[in-house]
Amino acid sequence: MTHQLRKSHPLLKLVNHSLIDLPTPSNISTWWNFGSLLGLTLMIQILTGVFLMMHFSPSDTTAFSSVAYTSREVWFGWLIRSFHTNGASIFFMFIFLHIGRGLYYASYLHENTWNVGVIMLFLLMATAFMGYVLPWGQMSFWGAAVITNLLSAIPYIGDTIVPWIWGGPSVNNATLTRFTALHFLLPFIILALLITHLIFLHERGSFNPAGLSKNTDKIPFHPYYTMKDVLGAVLAASMLLTLALYLPALLGDPENFTPANPMATPSHIKPEWYFLFAYAILRSIPNKLGGVLAMFSSIFILLLIPFLHTTTQQPMSLRPLSQLLFWTLILNFLALTWIGGKPVNSPYILLGQITSLLYFITILILMPLLGALENKTTKPPFI
């Protein structure tokens, strides 16, 4: 009876086709776990965010104290807040691993799925930035002032856009109110895009590590991969609990424990760690407009990846030179993240310029050239 119901009921049938009887390649590895982990962490972020919003006061005079009140007076408020703030870090760590897996195994050849994912990444970064502003601490205030002021670099309309976003001549109560509304709204838009992402994914099926035909050997998603996803969820929950309970302030900035003061500038303004790679690229270009364009290009360049795939082989599993270039790109990304957290002085300025240039050269020039070169080598007979 249950077997027939899940295949005939209009709603259960969708769940069955997506999570139970979904034909899945038999050889996908743990690297394919991050999709389900991202869905889980997104739901954790939405649920904890809704509970935090119940006690948040979007006013420049009471926002900081309302966050402190939530942590001190609300039943388990400290735990919910710790889950939300550290959950964002876990979320972005999984996102970067998910993107890295897509680059390594050429999942970007599903253009629709990949492009929706890149749009989700941009909206997630926008959502996280607005969320970072809400506590109205010292780093929140000055981070909002610096980043939003970058839009003034847009020719002709930049000086008009910035006061419109601020709701006045500077970052003020109207800015906080707008960011609160958008921070609450955007996760639900991201959730809709996630469903679109899954629809495109299930339309063509998942890639596999060997790059073989997707129809060669398939098994049902349940119970084989649901058990693997449950194990991944347990490990992810362990990481989140460790951060939330033992090291809740590890990934935060001490400056943000001080209420916002427009009359005192922090010695070093920097965003959260998951923005540091883009922040390093922004700082490495002395021209304001050039820096803004480079910062946004560091994200939207991912949209070009499918068009830069020149090799006839899909994954990098059998392409040792491409593997070397891939890990060079990963190390370059980590170097940019490290540089973005350092002060703007020597030698970090020069290092930032070198790593920023290498980031774009690797993606736009070296990877396509190496793919074309690999086409001239002898291909294994089963590719």
From Swiss-Prot:
Gene3D superfamilies recorded: Cytochrome Bc1 Complex, Chain C
Compartments (UniProt record): Mitochondrion inner membrane
Q: Name one GO biological process term.
A: mitochondrial electron transport, ubiquinol to cytochrome c
State the function annotated in the UniProt record.
Component of the ubiquinol-cytochrome c reductase complex (complex III or cytochrome b-c1 complex) that is part of the mitochondrial respiratory chain. The b-c1 complex mediates electron transfer from ubiquinol to cytochrome c. Contributes to the generation of a proton gradient across the mitochondrial membrane that is then used for ATP synthesis.
What UniProt keywords are attached to this protein's entry? Electron transport, Heme, Iron, Membrane, Metal-binding, Mitochondrion, Mitochondrion inner membrane, Respiratory chain, Transmembrane, Transmembrane helix, Transport, Ubiquinone
Q: Which cofactors does this gene product need?
A: heme b
Gene that specifies this protein: MT-CYB
Designated name of the protein:
Cytochrome b
Q: Cite the cofactor comment.
A: Binds 2 heme b groups non-covalently.
User: What taxonomic lineage is listed for the species of origin?
Assistant: Eukaryota, Metazoa, Chordata, Craniata, Vertebrata
